[in-house]
Amino acid sequence: MAVKPTKAEKKIAYDQKLCQLLDEYSQVLIASADNVGSNQLQAIRIGLRGDSIVLMGKNTMMKRSIRLHAENTGNENLRNVEQLFLPNVGLIFTKGDLNQVREEISKYKVGAPARFGLVAPIDVVVPPGNTGLDPSQTSFFQVLNIPTKINKGTVEIITAVELIKKGEKVGSSEAALLAKLGIRPFSYGLNVESVYDDGSVFSPEVLDLTEDDLLARFATGVSMVTSLSLAISYPTLAAAPHSSSMGATMFLLLLLQPTMTSLRPRKLRSISRILAVASCSCSSAGTAPTGGGAAAAAVEEKKEEPEEESDDDIGFSLFDD
């Protein structure tokens, strides 16, 4: 006959298992387990078998084990896990892709009836339509101020009604009506509340971000930095091409301002081309990977210029009367 371990021995074994998992796994999903049954939890364990382990336990025992293990190993990052604990918490240690593990967990959520006294996790709306109940059941609807009518010997709900709001407790009348209608409005399972990844802690919403989302946010950040740099005249790499272009344009305009009114139309056209080439060259220098690209762009620009006037019409002769 096997000897049953004592409570102290169970606590020691649990502590050793938790410490071993903390050393072996660098990724932990912290999940709430409200209203999750043992059969449902067993199904989740089977579904995650291979690269993930689900560990449940009392909060006080888990916090104590993590705190002592962090002190013994000198890994203070583990204290971040301790601060994320909620009532009825579960730890999911994994070596797989965090997003895939979370999706696998969500598959095991099951529908549940609205029992009296439960706090509603979502808004419960009763849809319009025929209920299939006989007219003697109208008292349930009248108590809850649900508009109904009798249609072909059955009770029909006229308009949709918000029966229970999120965060409210389910009353006896609401629970009885939903049971008669066969509505199971709630679903329960492990809900990932926080993510621990090698010392970093973040919200599970981060797992929903795609590469396109990251690129869009990066582009927005660069645009904001560029605008701010230009506004306060502070040099940054992002604003360098724009600053160079604006600087070259302003410099030429300042030089030409005293004689601008006396220039001939042909010389004004030459000035416009010079400003355009300067702007294009500065922009190319800021975006091209090497200097050769800017030079090639300048040469190509030169080739495309129509030879309308001689060399005497451009250059320093612009400042002559």
Swiss-Prot record:
Record InterPro entries: Ribosomal_protein_uL10 (IPR050323), Ribosomal_uL10 (IPR001790), Ribosomal_uL10-like_insert (IPR040637), Ribosomal_uL10-like_insert_sf (IPR043164), Ribosomal_uL10-like_sf (IPR043141), uL10_eukaryotes (IPR030670)
GO cellular component: cytosolic large ribosomal subunit
Keywords: Phosphoprotein, Ribonucleoprotein, Ribosomal protein
Gene Ontology BP terms: cytoplasmic translation; ribosomal large subunit assembly
Coiled-coil spans in chain: none
The record's account of how the chain is modified after translation: Phosphorylated.
Induction of expression: By blue light.
Ranges for region Disordered: 284-321
The UniProt record lists the keyword Transferase: no
Keyword Ribosomal protein set for record: yes
Compositionally skewed regions (Acidic residues) per UniProt: 306-321
GO MF terms, alphabetically ordered: large ribosomal subunit rRNA binding; structural constituent of ribosome
Description of how the protein assembles with itself and partners: P0 forms a pentameric complex by interaction with dimers of P1 and P2.
Function according to Swiss-Prot or TrEMBL: Ribosomal protein P0 is the functional equivalent of E.coli protein L10.
Family from the record: Belongs to the universal ribosomal protein uL10 family.
Designated name of the protein: Large ribosomal subunit protein uL10
Record organism: Oxybasis rubra (Red goosefoot)
